[in-house]
Amino acid sequence: MRRHMVCAVMGAIMATAGWSQSLTWLDTQFNPFTVPLGVSADGSVVVGMTESFPQQSRAFRWTRALGTQYLGTLGGNASAAYGVSANGSVVVGWAHDVNGQRRAFRWTAATGMVDLGALGGNQSEARGVSAEGSVVVGWAHDVNGQRRAFRWTAATGMIDLGTLGGAESEAWAVSADGSVVVGIAQDATGEWRGFRWTAQTGMIALGTRTFSRDAHLDVSADGSVVVGTHTPWRETAFRWTEATGMTDLPLPSGASVSFAYGVSGDGNIVVGGVDLMARAFRWRSSGEMDDLNSTYANLIGGGAMLWLATDVSPDGRYIVGVGMRGVYEAYLLDTGFPRRGDVDRNGCVDDADLLRVLFAFGERGYRDEDLNWDGIVDDADLLAVLFQFGSGC
């Protein structure tokens, strides 16, 4: 089968595209404070919240084609979007109902906002969604009004993930296939700790570092890398793996605090900020770090600044965050790397990339060869290489 496919693809007409970088300031209709919290795999969809008055935030979904779309509420006056599926079609977050209670929602163009319920209480929030949009995680009140981390699917509804021996927990992110959930939970002493949950292990503490309530965590595609911000003495960005434990990310000279908000699919790129929204930063597992304001100064221009990076696409190419350009504005940064179709990320779309897709053809799972991040290596991924063949070489 692969031999026939090779013959077919080698006979195809190749198209070459250039390598480009860009910075887009999102038009959210002049709201003075906009926070993007999620970006799709190809950078074409951004979700988050805008706020013009206290308690009047609105969940939004922005696309390159249509601009900003407000997703509404569940009958109340406020909402916020926290996560988006890989293809941008599923959005999750919270919205006020008619009683002013926060309720976790899952949105699609076909269904609109759907209330996901709670765990016996009145309120809930969705914080993360799996790559294909079928698994949602967050927190919900139980019958005692305590926050409990949940994992939701259409088949199971909300499942309480428990705690680390204390009263409350919150889930923040989920792996691409929905099997690994990360967040924070109280231990028996009432301290908040980071956790990693699977159906096999249950909730496992990430170590002894403490966290503030509502501390943000993110997880790599396969669930093996967790990033976030721990306390107590000062906010410090970290990267966790089972092999290394929790490792603090380096600080640039003169900085005192750091925040990590997003991680790439392979776990090698972490984005966030340093010094209380002063500079958007990017860290790499190799130890390199850079201030996005310096690296992309030619795109930003005078008088503007990238304050914070809040999410990064699975391949690490697209970064969203909050900047200042007279008012707080959301931005979408296209770093230009990796090129579309560049499976091995060496800057050149060539035979090596083509062969990797061919030999992985039909395989399921979120991997480098799955270029469109839909969970299977198929024709779409093959075409992505073909249409960019020769780029950068």
List PLM regions with ranges:
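Conserved "turn/edge" positions that cap or connect secondary-structure elements
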Residues: G18-P338
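Bacterial N-terminal signal peptides
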Residues: C7-A17
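Positively charged n-region of N-terminal signal peptides that target proteins for export
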Residues: M1-H4
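Cellulosome-associated attachment modules in secreted, modular CAZymes
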Residues: L299-G303, E329, T335-C393
